[in-house]
Amino acid sequence: MDDLKSIIGKVATGAPLSREQAASAFDSMMSGEATPSQMGALLMALRVRGETVEEITGAVSVMRAKMLRVDAPANAVDIVGTGGDGSGSVNVSTCASFIVAGAGVPVAKHGNRALSSRSGAADVLAALGVKIDLKPDQVGRCIREAGIGFMFAPAHHPAMKNVGPTRVELATRTIFNLLGPLSNPAGVKRQMVGVFSRQWVEPLAQVLKNLGSGAAWVVHGSDGLDEITLTGPTFVAALENGHIRTFEISPEEAGLGLCDSEGLKGGDAAANAVALQSVLDGLPSPYRDVALLNAAAALVVAGRAKSLKEGVAIGKDSLDSGAAAGRLKQLIAVSNS
């Protein structure tokens, strides 16, 4: 197996790494064997040249091997974004997760604190009263009893502590911004992943295919959102039955109206928590509609809906019946017990 120095030398020439070489390099970094200089050199060389599907696949395989796993039902789904889109939007995937859970599909939500906004999934859930820093068996209990559990990334990826300081010092996006959403500790086979750039939509779908995902949508809004947007089209790469299909979707085809970007602007964790609760309480808003649209796509990925329109109808029922709000109440109770 190539040593780290020779791998860094190879990347420095612009040559791609094999999946095995990438896995070897990331194992060195995450096990603490690599020096900060070596980590910085490799991460920036990959970033400047552009990471390949094989390199990301190798890196994710190491991250998955080192994570602390959570037991979840085989049909569990995740709705997750890379963050880093710079939009400062409301917490779309978190709200959509409660809608999906309210529709009877188990959700194993993976997330972290804010990356570029003022409120990430962990921030808003903590503001709502959910205990986020749980052990894997406690998260599994949440999924079983509340129909939804939250896996706080730092608690499930302890090996990341070895690369954390280097990432902070680099202060720029690296391959690790792509790895987290692909490394769900519950090992979900069905997920919706939002990405910060259109260039990653199809490659990340290919990575998920390489790693054995059953069904997935990788999405990027035309306005830059790492979610399905309500302001215009969204680019999608869908993994279905071992094949990847690319297409665009619009809110109109799901029976929803367009909004401007101001309608999706968020605030800090406290403000976003109030906004999320108001959606679960049934109040109409662009936030409700964008959460419904993302939930609808997740319901399609989960096999619960055949189309976005049907997914929106199921999502509306989850909200209007109080089921989605009930899932949040249950998660607060179970996570704190």
From Swiss-Prot:
Residues holding Mg(2+) 1: 93, 227
Residue sites binding anthranilate 2 per the record: 167
Cofactor note: Binds 2 magnesium ions per monomer.
Residues bound to 5-phospho-alpha-D-ribose 1-diphosphate: 81, 84-85, 89, 91-94, 109-117, 121
Signal sequence coordinates: none
Function of the protein: Catalyzes the transfer of the phosphoribosyl group of 5-phosphorylribose-1-pyrophosphate (PRPP) to anthranilate to yield N-(5'-phosphoribosyl)-anthranilate (PRA).
Enzyme class of the recorded protein, top EC level: transferase
Keyword Nucleus appears in the UniProt entry: no
Protein's name in the database: Anthranilate phosphoribosyltransferase
Biological process, per Gene Ontology: L-tryptophan biosynthetic process
Catalytic function, reaction form: N-(5-phospho-beta-D-ribosyl)anthranilate + diphosphate = 5-phospho-alpha-D-ribose 1-diphosphate + anthranilate
Provenance organism: Bradyrhizobium sp. (strain ORS 278)
Entry cofactors: Mg(2+)
Pathway: Amino-acid biosynthesis; L-tryptophan biosynthesis; L-tryptophan from chorismate: step 2/5
Chain positions recorded as Mg(2+) 2 binding sites: 226-227
Positions contributing to anthranilate 1 binding: 81, 112
EC id: 2.4.2.18
Sorted UniProt keywords: Amino-acid biosynthesis, Aromatic amino acid biosynthesis, Glycosyltransferase, Magnesium, Metal-binding, Transferase, Tryptophan biosynthesis
